[in-house]
């Protein structure tokens, strides 16, 4: 796997245990909103069973002017995450591989979109909505249900910025029952006149896919993010 070098410029603590790593863009490197890449850190001592590469979604867009990934670092974490938390500093180099994935909005094919995101699964959604903010589609309505059981939400300022985008509604939810109820209500009301994007852990993606299909939503209307990096 070939890696290009990006320079870390800033680390932002988004929540009590989630951090964004912001980097320069290597000349000639491009990507589409919703894609993920392999990131590589070198020069740090890692556990023998650990590796220096992880897949994370690119949470920024080309228009942002920087590369960014966001990851959760729990109390119990790998030596890779320990390097991110306590060792890596602005000015250090991070390897970036070729972008992968096709997780995207279809604002031309549908009049409505429901986005269901849980926890750190919000990262591709941030990129998709950032791109949509620059190029909104007239008459298209997007509803975002972003849930975190602890009530800790990444990108707080970004959600305020989205309030200016016509047709975009964001609900920040900290109650799991409300999260599921709001999803059910939307699916029952809108049915297959919308596309449904799900971004969370593999378990959440599977559970909500089954839930939506049980409410009559066609499989082809449901997209799930490949949640590789934690």
Task: Give the location of each predicted region.
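Ferredoxin-reductase
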Residues: 2-90, 148-150
């Amino acid at each position: 796997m070939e890696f290009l070098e990006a320079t870390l410029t800033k680390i932002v603590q988004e929540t009590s245990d989630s951090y964004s790593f912001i980097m320069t863009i290597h000349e000639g490197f491009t990507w589409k909103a919703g894609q993920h890449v392999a990131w590589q850190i070198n020069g740090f001592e890692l556990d023998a069973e650990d590796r220096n590469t992880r897949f994370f979604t690119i949470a920024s867009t080309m228009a942002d002017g920087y590369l960014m990934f966001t990851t959760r670092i729990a109390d119990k974490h790998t030596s890779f995450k320990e390097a991110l938390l306590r060792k890596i500093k602005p000015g250090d180099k991070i390897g970036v591989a070729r972008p992968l994935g096709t997780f995207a909005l279809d604002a031309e094919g549908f009049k409505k979109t429901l986005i269901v995101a849980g926890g750190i699964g919000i990262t591709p959604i941030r990129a998709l909505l950032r791109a949509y903010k620059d190029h909104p589609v007239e008459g298209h309505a997007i509803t975002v249900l972003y849930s975190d059981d602890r009530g800790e939400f990444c990108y707080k300022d970004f959600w305020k910025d989205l309030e200016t985008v016509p047709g975009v509604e964001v609900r920040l939810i900290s109650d799991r029952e409300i999260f599921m109820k709001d999803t059910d209500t939307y699916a029952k009301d809108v049915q297959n006149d919308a596309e449904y994007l799900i971004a969370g852990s593999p378990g959440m993606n599977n559970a909500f896919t089954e839930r939506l299909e049980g409410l009559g939503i066609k499989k082809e209307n449901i997209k799930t993010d490949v949640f590789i990096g934690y």
